[in-house]
């Protein structure tokens, strides 16, 4: 009994510390100096009554990544190259806070990977074969992935399964690549200065490890070129006269002074980031800890402990010494979004054979929203003999994210979503030009873009309903964020009321993409089984133009916000679906902004606004190729193509408006409207920006962070 009592006392004594560790953040360190700094941070946080911190020791970044994934640690800061590795299976970590560089007046969450040489050398970037090289570490961004990716054409590397490290070892006469396997590839560790087991070590035990170590390798004369970041030489040589003894190698085989890194660099790289688990990652706790740490011990503080400083002889412990602070990364950002398409392309190029790289560049990956679009896309892919392949996502924003990450190339979007895509850095490729009477296919491709009219349509029998009396009625919308169904009518409503409480203006609505538990989803019906209610894809039967009009036709709503062409395409036998078969155009009318009503045929004088055409978007580096492929594809499968309707039609759908609008005559050239601002027009861009005061999208928030 006495032993049991003592055991209980022991557990009670341990309990608070165990609970504190669960609540607190466990930071992973990779060396004794890092562990010592972590311990000091822990003590100083305790002194200022900050968040709880404990320190976990491992031997390498990989072991720390594994510990975080296994819930034996919670966080650490990683170079972008390691952020990529940590974001892959089986770890699936994500960046939660970015280190901020630059100055207080001009902060930035990126840096530039550069190739640094001594001024008295005669080297150019295309003359590095056979020289001695200094690297920050294996698989790190500025020191390995970027330079090796840049030099790939000269390496004589056929791609996997041939080892990349072997190709690099044979390319340079000697190197120091900390973390490399010196037994298997001795040339990669030949220049390293560590002794015994510390030679080529993956930590500061190797004097030439990290940015400052790679620079020291060059400065000491061990190497001829150092692959580092733009600030490395400034941090190690405060004296300008000393810095002037070094120059940068530029991709165009010229050289520039070290302060011209924005014009002479190998790549722009996202800054180091603190990573955590994607699920159950303690993101809020980590951010509270970082916020308190930078407030109490960051730049400009006077205490003896400095968060962004390392003891003499050490560099970049826990965080970069040159960091100014942290910025929280929006929750929508995963490792691939954080790194961006250019950096991801470099990484993919290092994982694929030359043939695979070429094949990937020749393919067009279309992003289909939902299962119905995917089925049509797969039909297209089969008929295109693999020129077009398909991927899918649940909604348009997820598709945009796939395009940003290089996992997809293109999709066609409503103008409101083109706004988000443009803010994220994508560009228009071709526009959906509406079907018109007469005119050849060539005329259509080169025809000036007109767009469509956004209208408010009601049943003729609801005689008392006007634009001025729509408060309290039931409304049908194409989807939240879409042009005719949301941005235009709700933008007008916001201008009228200056209120964002849209769910209080109408009694009930169906606005796919809204909160499923709100009034804005009350009229939505989901699929035939009642699932996916209010989903922003074709699983919701009241989604998009035809769905919004169907919501009105089936008496769910009193007013539907659609395009004029939507109303014209469905009545009088034009609509093929069961709900549209007995409709008559004369049974519907339009609400005019002046409070009157007019027949649908008079939409030119009774509409809410002109809506920009749907358009195909892609990454800027793919626009020219996408235009070429899509014009070729519509030459075969377009409205006048020889294989439509026999084989496949781009602009026909089993249901409605899959991949493209069914009333598209052709994909037309942009007539100079090559940016999202020019494509949408200044008035529409301003209207959407104003409406964004009421709500933002997680993707738009993420892109705003990533592009600053």
Swiss-Prot record:
<comment type="similarity">
    <text>Belongs to the transferrin family.</text>
</comment>
<feature type="binding site">
    <location>
        <position position="140"/>
    </location>
    <ligand>
        <name>hydrogencarbonate 1</name>
    </ligand>
</feature>
<feature type="disulfide bond">
    <location>
        <begin position="189"/>
        <end position="200"/>
    </location>
</feature>
<dbReference type="GO" id="GO:0006508">
    <property type="term" value="P:proteolysis"/>
</dbReference>
<feature type="signal peptide">
    <location>
        <begin position="1"/>
        <end position="19"/>
    </location>
</feature>
<dbReference type="InterPro" id="IPR001156">
    <property type="entry name" value="Transferrin-like_dom"/>
</dbReference>
<dbReference type="GO" id="GO:0005769">
    <property type="term" value="C:early endosome"/>
</dbReference>
<dbReference type="InterPro" id="IPR016357">
    <property type="entry name" value="Transferrin"/>
</dbReference>
<comment type="subunit">
    <text>Monomer. Found in a complex with LTF, CLU, EPPIN and SEMG1. Interacts with prey activated coagulation factor X; the interaction inhibits coagulation factor X catalytic activity. Found in a complex with MPO and LTF; interacts directly with CP, allows Fe(3+) incorporation into LTF and activation of CP ferroxidase activity.</text>
</comment>
<keyword id="KW-1203">Blood coagulation cascade inhibiting toxin</keyword>
<feature type="binding site">
    <location>
        <position position="614"/>
    </location>
    <ligand>
        <name>Fe(3+) 2</name>
    </ligand>
</feature>
<feature type="disulfide bond">
    <location>
        <begin position="134"/>
        <end position="217"/>
    </location>
</feature>
<feature type="binding site">
    <location>
        <position position="484"/>
    </location>
    <ligand>
        <name>hydrogencarbonate 2</name>
    </ligand>
</feature>
<feature type="active site" description="Nucleophile">
    <location>
        <position position="278"/>
    </location>
</feature>
<feature type="binding site">
    <location>
        <position position="136"/>
    </location>
    <ligand>
        <name>hydrogencarbonate 1</name>
    </ligand>
</feature>
<feature type="binding site">
    <location>
        <position position="478"/>
    </location>
    <ligand>
        <name>hydrogencarbonate 2</name>
    </ligand>
</feature>
<feature type="binding site">
    <location>
        <position position="545"/>
    </location>
    <ligand>
        <name>Fe(3+) 2</name>
    </ligand>
</feature>
<keyword id="KW-1015">Disulfide bond</keyword>
<keyword id="KW-0964">Secreted</keyword>
<feature type="glycosylation site" description="N-linked (GlcNAc...) asparagine">
    <location>
        <position position="495"/>
    </location>
</feature>
<feature type="domain" description="Transferrin-like 2">
    <location>
        <begin position="364"/>
        <end position="693"/>
    </location>
</feature>
<feature type="disulfide bond">
    <location>
        <begin position="510"/>
        <end position="524"/>
    </location>
</feature>
<feature type="glycosylation site" description="N-linked (GlcNAc...) asparagine">
    <location>
        <position position="385"/>
    </location>
</feature>
<keyword id="KW-0479">Metal-binding</keyword>
<keyword id="KW-0677">Repeat</keyword>
<feature type="binding site">
    <location>
        <position position="111"/>
    </location>
    <ligand>
        <name>Fe(3+) 1</name>
    </ligand>
</feature>
<feature type="glycosylation site" description="N-linked (GlcNAc...) asparagine">
    <location>
        <position position="139"/>
    </location>
</feature>
<keyword id="KW-1199">Hemostasis impairing toxin</keyword>
<feature type="binding site">
    <location>
        <position position="211"/>
    </location>
    <ligand>
        <name>Fe(3+) 1</name>
    </ligand>
</feature>
<comment type="function">
    <text>Transferrins are iron binding transport proteins which can bind two Fe(3+) ions in association with the binding of an anion, usually bicarbonate.</text>
</comment>
<feature type="binding site">
    <location>
        <position position="452"/>
    </location>
    <ligand>
        <name>Fe(3+) 2</name>
    </ligand>
</feature>
<keyword id="KW-0800">Toxin</keyword>
<feature type="disulfide bond">
    <location>
        <begin position="592"/>
        <end position="606"/>
    </location>
</feature>
<feature type="binding site">
    <location>
        <position position="143"/>
    </location>
    <ligand>
        <name>hydrogencarbonate 1</name>
    </ligand>
</feature>
<keyword id="KW-0645">Protease</keyword>
<protein>
    <recommendedName>
        <fullName>Lactotransferrin</fullName>
        <ecNumber>3.4.21.-</ecNumber>
    </recommendedName>
</protein>
<keyword id="KW-0929">Antimicrobial</keyword>
<keyword id="KW-0720">Serine protease</keyword>
<feature type="disulfide bond">
    <location>
        <begin position="250"/>
        <end position="264"/>
    </location>
</feature>
<dbReference type="GO" id="GO:0005615">
    <property type="term" value="C:extracellular space"/>
</dbReference>
<dbReference type="GO" id="GO:0001503">
    <property type="term" value="P:ossification"/>
</dbReference>
<feature type="binding site">
    <location>
        <position position="79"/>
    </location>
    <ligand>
        <name>Fe(3+) 1</name>
    </ligand>
</feature>
